[in-house]
Amino acid sequence: MATIKEIKELLVTVKELESPIFLELEKDNRSGVQKEISKRKRAIQAELDENLRLESMLSYEKELYKQGLTLIAGIDEVGRGPLAGPVVAAAVILPKNCKIKGLNDSKKIPKKKHLEIFQAVQDQALSIGIGIIDNQVIDQVNIYEATKLAMQEAISQLSPQPEHLLIDAMKLDLPISQTSIIKGDANSLSIAAASIVAKVTRDELMKEYDQQFPGYDFATNAGYGTAKHLEGLTKLGATPIHRTSFEPVKSLVLGKKES
């Protein structure tokens, strides 16, 4: 009779819920064996569910594949809302039918998984471009226009150049066919890939700024208006990376000028 350890090793090789190996092992009354069977079945079901989720997130890409297009770039940005730091956009071209386990809208990915999935995108992408527009430009042109500039910069770095753009809720004035998708980072794998690249890139930048400008908790809040950030603003004033067109930074800077 096989040991439970041997059965566990055998079950790792089973990839289908209908496998005859399960039927055979289910005759074994040992509780340890039944426990391993249940565990393996749950793992297989989780893999099937994940594959279905990823498949559903390729629906926009698959429509474009039917038209003979394969160089499809997903575009997304991070950092529209913060009081400090740049807006960062990423453009990512994934290989045809590429599925990266765990890839999703970056807001839905556990923080501890960010770097792992970012690395998987880096490893598998055909091309990646990153656009970074700083707070000074944001203050000059407004955040919406700055976001478009960041996206255009990211796209310009792609090689090969894309045949079609899938963009998260935005239209760009570029001579490339494009589709604007509401909640694109949750509905397109290409956009989700851009989302995690932009997110990790910006988070790392804000960690560096935290070293330069201590007291605002940038490493944790990424420039968003948390209690610690606002406390730092009140005590220390605005830094060179703060967006002076955003409240409450604007009022704080104006108040200091008037006094």
From Swiss-Prot:
Enumerate the cofactors the protein uses: Mn(2+); Mg(2+)
Look up keyword Hydrolase and say if it applies. yes
Binding of a divalent metal cation occurs at 76-77, 168
Q: Which UniProt keywords apply?
A: Cytoplasm, Endonuclease, Hydrolase, Manganese, Metal-binding, Nuclease
- All copies of the RNase H type-2 domain together span 70-258
Subcellular location as annotated: Cytoplasm
The cross-references to InterPro entries, in alphabetical order and at most eight, read: RNase_HII, RNase_HII/HIII, RNase_HII/HIII_dom, RNaseH-like_sf, RNaseH_sf
Enzyme Commission numbers on file: 3.1.26.4
Cofactor, how bound (note): Manganese or magnesium. Binds 1 divalent metal ion per monomer in the absence of substrate. May bind a second metal ion after substrate binding.
What biological processes does GO assign it? Answer: DNA replication, removal of RNA primer; mismatch repair
* Catalytic function, reaction form: Endonucleolytic cleavage to 5'-phosphomonoester
Q: Which Pfam families match?
A: RNase_HII
Provide the GO MF annotations for this entry. Answer: manganese ion binding; RNA binding; RNA-DNA hybrid ribonuclease activity
Secreted is among the record's keywords: no
**What is a single cellular component term in the Gene Ontology annotation?**
ribonuclease H2 complex
Source organism, top-level taxon: Bacteria
Q: Which family does it belong to?
A: Belongs to the RNase HII family.
Q: What does this protein do?
A: Endonuclease that specifically degrades the RNA of RNA-DNA hybrids.
Instruction: Provide the protein name.
Output: Ribonuclease HII
What gene name does this entry carry?
Answer: rnhB
